[in-house]
């Protein structure tokens, strides 16, 4: 997705330090950032925030983190958080490679990867969020019962991710090869998902865990 640069976005985000971490001020203190101590779920690459804000509104007993590096998108997530008065959702404006700088070992209960960039060229495989270096970060911060939820419309990325996770020592608790035909009604749409599923795109989804989190 091409992002149109918003020169004012950075200042807008900096005006809300209680909701947005721009420079790691809450690194290692995620639990303390929230009003209540509750399980933490993360979405990496939240886009405009429809998915994560819907989850937060539906589940006040869970604390959510939206992690998105593009400042010109993050402001839309912030707008939704303010409009919906969500106290259980915070935003990190940074790259996923910094995850273990923010979260302690075993601090997270769930990670969502929704419609991540497929980086289709082989030379860019290291940038895929299901490449083994990222999986190692997820394993580090997830607790023993924690899991990873992955959703994409890119068949190649889905196949790659299944293989990458299997080779890393993960197992799958759920796999959907055509989510919108198999959905039990619990699926929450992202903005991207709604747009492309209406055009007939097939959506792939999986849930996975590590055999040994540590």
UniProtKB/Swiss-Prot annotation:
Location of the active site: 117
Binding-site residues, S-adenosyl-L-methionine: 43, 68, 95, 117
Any GO MF annotation of the entry: tRNA (guanine(46)-N7)-methyltransferase activity
Entry keyword Lyase: no
E.C. numbers: 2.1.1.33
Listed InterPro entries: SAM-dependent_MTases_sf, tRNA_(Gua-N-7)_MeTrfase_Trmb, tRNA_methyltr_TrmB_bact
GO cellular component terms attached to this protein's record: tRNA methyltransferase complex
SUPFAM superfamilies documented for this protein: S-adenosyl-L-methionine-dependent methyltransferases
Keywords attached to this entry: Methyltransferase, S-adenosyl-L-methionine, Transferase, tRNA processing
Transmembrane segments: none
Residue positions binding substrate: 121, 153, 190-193
Superkingdom per UniProt: Bacteria
Entry-linked PROSITE patterns: SAM_MT_TRMB
Record field: catalytic activity: guanosine(46) in tRNA + S-adenosyl-L-methionine = N(7)-methylguanosine(46) in tRNA + S-adenosyl-L-homocysteine
Involved pathway(s): tRNA modification; N(7)-methylguanine-tRNA biosynthesis
tRNA-binding among keywords: no
UniProt similarity note: Belongs to the class I-like SAM-binding methyltransferase superfamily. TrmB family.
HAMAP family (UniProt xref): tRNA_methyltr_TrmB
NCBIfam families, A to Z: PRK00121.2-2, tRNA (guanosine(46)-N7)-methyltransferase TrmB
Record function comment: Catalyzes the formation of N(7)-methylguanine at position 46 (m7G46) in tRNA.
Protein name (database record): tRNA (guanine-N(7)-)-methyltransferase
Gene, per the UniProt record: trmB
